[in-house]
Every structure is written in C-alpha cells, then in structure tokens.
C-alpha cells in the first residue's frame, strides 16, 4: 500500500480543492468537509457500531430494505451510514432522521481512515456496490474487523481501471471477507481482480427490494395529458430530450425533466430558454406538474417515485453520455414503457432483460427518441403489467438472503 498512499498524498490537493469547490458551489455547509478528514461533530454511539457505506443517492435508496433488516437482526447495535455526496447525505437524513448515525466517509488517506476507525470501531462493515476504498478495507482487515462487499457490481470500465492500478493496491480485493455481486459478469471480474472464488456469490440487486409494495399510482388528474418522465438526467442530456420532444406531434404530451443533481437547475433553465422555451419549475407550482406548460423541470429531490406513478412513459438518464445509465427499476415498478440512450453498463443485465422483453427501447439521438416516444405514447396502458410484475417478484429478496450468504 506504500505506493498507493504516496500517489494519494501527491494528488490529494486536487481532490481536496475539488471537493471544497463543489461544497461551496452547491451551498453546503463548509464545516461538513471536516467530516472528510474524520472530524465529526455529531452524536457518538455508546453501542457497538455496524457501518454501511453507500456512495450516493442510488446506493442509499437501494439499501433501504437491507438497512431495515440490519436493524431487526442487530437491535443492540447502532447503524452508521456514510456516503460521499451532498444529495446522498440529504437522502439519508430524509429516510432515517435520527434513527441512524450519519457522516461523510473520510478521504481514503491512511491517517483519516485510522482516525475514523478509532472513533467508531465498527464491528461489521458493509460496502455497497463499487465503493472500493483500499485503505479502509486494508485497515479493517489488519484490525480483524469483518468487511463485506454487498450488492457488488463491476462494470467493464471500472474493471479495466482496477486492472491498471492493481499492482499498487496490495491485493485489496482478497481482503474482503465475502462478496455478494449482482451478475455473472460482475462475479467473473471480481474473481479476476483477486476476490477469493470461495468467498463470492451472485444474487439479484438490492434495487429490486427497494421497490415498496403495494404498487399504487397517485390520484392524479391529468386532464388528458400524457407525461414523459425523464429521470436522473445529466448535462447535456436535457437539450437532446427537449429537441426530441419538440419534434413530437402530440399536443397532449408534457415533458418532465428530473435532473440527477437538482443544483444544476439554473444552468438547465438557461439552456432551455436559449431554445425559446420557458419551463415550469416544480417548486414554483406547489410541487405539482403544471399541465398548462409542455415542459416541467423538477428542482426538488424525493419526488421521483410519485412522478413515475403519474407517468405514461419514462426515459432513464445518464445513458445518452458515457455515464453507464441509472436505475430502470422504479419506472418498471409502474409498468411503464421505458427508453434510454446506449450507455447503460451500470445496469447491463437488467437493461438486456428489458430489451428482450420489449419494455426498453434504446435510442441515442433526438430523432430516434422522438420515434420511440411516438410509439410508446400510443401503446395500450398497462399492457406490460404482467411481464413487469413477474419479473420483479422473481428477483426480490436479495437483501434478506444476504445475511444467509454471510452467515450472520
């Protein structure tokens, strides 16, 4: 780990100033950046601690059932949930309030991680998806504290990056006590990176369990309008989506843009206004869709599920650019026809399943999306309900099965 730590110290000023800039730019309390040096000013735990590390919103939402199960199985422990992003932090607070402890995960500098582990002394650590922090895992291993990677995934892009730096990571993957991954390709990649093949297993994604039951739609008066919910969009996807929408010959259609990071809203408004369009802001319309405007922009977090329940079709963002896509499952829960761009490597197996079931259509241009939306808007409502219902039910339960895999 010496070479890794040396390189990390060299590039750390860049990491720090980037983090500080984002904190100031998006209005976060600058004091919270001290948590990333493991200076924590909140309440401490007098109970044994179980640590769950979820990088951002997606992992936080996906782990809801898993967190509930931990609380049931370990009633004498305190749960500490860490993340690295402001939106992830806000989501943790909104979902759990004071029922869990929360702070940012410190930078993976050795002295920061040592201080963090000294403060909390986690009895068990669960790392979600792809959050491989070499010093965290190495020090937990040295201290003989259990560390598990759960709901793990490893895209081809991440795999190739890890292969390049493996010589300086001191076989970090072999130090995981057990790994539960989401797909066959993930399993093969983890083993190739050094995970012990006897301590890894494949199961379905926790995201299937995060879909709350019952599947009910909001009581929404759409007045004959058809909603296209474009979820978790990234720059510059909004411009492509607005262009596709402008080519639609459907006077009843409304485009609803839900950016992955709401702090980008002011820039999105400027970009859309350059196209001669003035969108309605969700926060300015009593947190409701403005049916009198053809383009709505959601500038609040926590409303995506409700919006999907009102939708006719859905587009999933992070896919028109090389970001690997976002979660398809919340849209699938409401049996919506789905579209996306061609970049969905973060959800490869799910995307391939949905394409085979003719639920997901893929287009990487405004012209292609326009044609897809025309077809989907004219489809029979709920015609895919049976397919989606069976697909989801067959894949639920991974959050509970994880504890059997881990013998906990």
Which residues make up each language-model segment?
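Nucleotide-activated sugar donor-binding and catalytic core shared by glycosyltransferases
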Residues: 1-408
